[in-house]
Swiss-Prot record:
CDD domains xref list: TM4SF9_like_LEL
UniProt membrane topology term: Multi-pass membrane protein
Keyword field contains Cell cycle: no
Family annotation (PANTHER family): TETRASPANIN, TETRASPANIN-5
Transmembrane segments: 18-38, 62-82, 93-113, 233-253
Stretches in topological domain Cytoplasmic: 1-17, 83-92, 254-268
UniProt family annotation: Belongs to the tetraspanin (TM4SF) family.
Maturation and modification: Palmitoylated.
The protein, known as: Tetraspanin-5
Amino acid sequence: MSGKHYKGPEVSCCIKYFIFGFNVIFWFLGIAFLGIGLWAWNEKGVLSNISSITDLGGFDPVWLFLVVGGVMFILGFAGCIGALRENTFLLKFFSVFLGIIFFLELTAGVLAFVFKDWIKDQLYFFINNNIRAYRDDIDLQNLIDFTQEYWQCCGAFGADDWNLNIYFNCTDSNASRERCGVPFSCCTKDPAEDVINTQCGYDARQKPEVDQQIVIYTKGCVPQFEKWLQDNLTIVAGIFIGIALLQIFGICLAQNLVSDIEAVRASW
């Protein structure tokens, strides 16, 4: 007479190692971002003089790497170790942290839609504040140059915003050779030229507006960004929805694994 053995609850290996594998990648990406951020700060001498963090008048792009890298590192660590060691505390922390990020993203999206005019004004102030600090930090300078080249724009709402910078303003007291000019990233590109002419923006704003349009981009970066957003709204919305679904999926998997672990422990 053969007896039937009762098979108790088990932890799903598929869910466990899927969460582990996904978060290992996330963890290493976080370490890479943090490493890039710390390396950039070391190159600037920030690590040897922490007080210099507050010296920059504009936005330091290195903060993006440090913040994003820090969040990815914490999430990756909690998800990876929590799944591998079947640690319910870390898995619950992973779920809650991911849920908070999802809630903040959702809130930011709603607020951006409701207060879009206010967001537009803040973006204008943000860009102009960084225009003032254009020469203060090489990373900020590269970010502004990339933005203006990519969007084919100049300043927040136009080339005259560069009057805010001490090197490019048109005042009589400005002895800079760049006086009444714009950075090279504002210049229209000639496909026949392989070498970038870094002096192409000199004296550009002293010319009549009709002549300016031939030499430099006259549209501001805020209107150009709005236009790009309208033209690519479906793609942008799809990306955000995809990220949101991945976050929900991650929360559900982590909670499912927690339930399996607690069920197994309860059967002991």
